[in-house]
């Protein structure tokens, strides 16, 4: 069944998915992985971080997390 979509204004998109109308199959067109230590991803004003010993596990036993094959 077709969808009727009205006027749309998108100023900015970062790391998201926008769908218009009917959607059957969604899959990312790119992927990435990062490992951050304790408190490394914090943002904002006046941060106070009290971290003791930190050990981030970088071991990843699987070969592929999400395949990119067939994504146009």
Curated annotation (Swiss-Prot):
Induction comment from the UniProt entry of this chain = Expression is sigma K-dependent and negatively regulated by GerE.
Q: Which organism is it from?
A: Bacillus subtilis (strain 168)
- Provide the gene name from the record: gerPF
Q: Name one GO biological process term.
A: sporulation resulting in formation of a cellular spore
Q: Which keywords does this Swiss-Prot/TrEMBL entry list?
A: Germination, Sporulation
Give disulfide pairs as residue numbers.
none
Name of the protein in question: Probable spore germination protein GerPF
The upper taxonomy is: Bacteria, Bacillati, Bacillota, Bacilli, Bacillales
Q: Which InterPro entries match?
A: Spore_germination_GerPA
Q: What does this protein do?
A: Required for the formation of functionally normal spores. Could be involved in the establishment of normal spore coat structure and/or permeability, which allows the access of germinants to their receptor.
Does Ion transport count among this protein's keywords?
A: no
Transmembrane segments annotated in the record for this chain: none
**What is stated as this protein's family in its record?**
Belongs to the GerPA/GerPF family.
> Has keyword Repeat?
no
């Amino acid at each position: 069944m077709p969808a009727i979509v009205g006027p749309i204004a998108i100023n900015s998109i970062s790391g998201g998915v926008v769908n218009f109308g009917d959607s059957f199959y969604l899959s990312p067109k790119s992927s990435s992985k990062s490992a951050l230590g304790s408190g490394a991803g914090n943002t904002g004003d006046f941060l106070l971080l009290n971290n003791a010993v930190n050990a981030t596990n970088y071991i990843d036993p699987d070969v592929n997390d999400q395949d990119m094959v067939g994504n146009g």
